[in-house]
């Protein structure tokens, strides 16, 4: 299990992981790593939250929120934000399904993708600022948001098909079973309940699950399935929805 965790941490983040810690794990077994997603999210969110707490006293809430969101993006290499931008460029192009998928493969940033990045990043900064003004624990909120968003991404993998012939998303999409999905969601729920007691965290997770499930169905209808880009979009939007649900 530890080898699987380190392999997943290296796969979906840019955090330094000694190669020997994940050596010997076949790429075809990576789908089993879905159950580690909430734990990885917990780690990323905690680091981002610590950055916020350290900077808040020095430069104020808005700038602390800005840098915490920036650090979160840097730790993932902008991987999920890139998926969000590509998904919006493709889906909102109003072209045929095949053309949408081609646009999503294009490395150039389009208008819809640019707008999505601006709105999502700005919304996160504003929500974190508002949560601070309301006295919510930011470290716990960010840790829970990142754990839940990565856990609920399993809803776009279970019983979904991969929309392309090949790609990184094919490692997970359509490859995880019901037990893995339940364990992943269960871990995310436990983290949310422990970090944000009083059912506040669990209620926010339920809202996030509903939103991501609906997103998955809409993308399935539009694209004929899911891709690595849509998983990234789901994670980014899941973080935002969870934080909004805490207001």
From Swiss-Prot:
It catalyses: alpha-ribazole + adenosylcob(III)inamide-GDP = adenosylcob(III)alamin + GMP + H(+); alpha-ribazole 5'-phosphate + adenosylcob(III)inamide-GDP = adenosylcob(III)alamin 5'-phosphate + GMP + H(+). InterPro entries: CobS (IPR003805). PANTHER family: ADENOSYLCOBINAMIDE-GDP RIBAZOLETRANSFERASE. GO terms for molecular function: adenosylcobinamide-GDP ribazoletransferase activity; cobalamin 5'-phosphate synthase activity. Joins adenosylcobinamide-GDP and alpha-ribazole to generate adenosylcobalamin (Ado-cobalamin). Also synthesizes adenosylcobalamin 5'-phosphate from adenosylcobinamide-GDP and alpha-ribazole 5'-phosphate. HAMAP family: CobS. The gene is cobS. The keyword Secreted does not apply. This is Adenosylcobinamide-GDP ribazoletransferase.
């Amino acid at each position: 299990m530890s080898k699987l965790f380190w392999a997943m941490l290296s796969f979906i983040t840019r955090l330094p992981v000694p190669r020997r810690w994940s050596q010997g794990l076949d790429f075809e077994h990576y789908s089993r790593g879905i159950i580690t997603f909430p734990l990885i999210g917990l780690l990323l969110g905690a680091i981002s939250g610590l950055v916020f707490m350290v900077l808040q006293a020095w430069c104020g809430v808005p700038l602390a929120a800005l840098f915490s969101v920036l650090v979160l993006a840097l730790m993932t290499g902008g991987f999920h934000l890139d998926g969000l931008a590509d998904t919006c460029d493709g889906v909102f192009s109003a072209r045929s399904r095949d053309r949408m998928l081609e646009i999503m493969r294009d490395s150039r940033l389009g208008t819809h993708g640019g707008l999505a990045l601006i709105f999502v990043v700005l919304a996160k900064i504003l929500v974190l600022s508002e949560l601070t003004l309301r006295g919510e624990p930011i470290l716990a909120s960010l840790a829970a948001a990142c754990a839940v968003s990565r856990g609920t991404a399993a809803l776009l993998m279970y019983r979904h098909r991969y929309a392309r012939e090949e790609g990184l998303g094919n490692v997970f999409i359509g490859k995880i079973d019901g037990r893995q999905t339940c364990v992943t969601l269960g871990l995310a729920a436990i983290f949310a309940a422990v970090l944000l007691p009083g059912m506040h965290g669990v209620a926010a997770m339920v809202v996030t699950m509903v939103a991501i499930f609906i997103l998955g169905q809409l993308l399935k209808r539009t694209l004929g399935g899911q891709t690595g880009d849509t998983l990234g979009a789901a994670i980014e939007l899941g973080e935002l929805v969870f934080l909004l649900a805490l207001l």
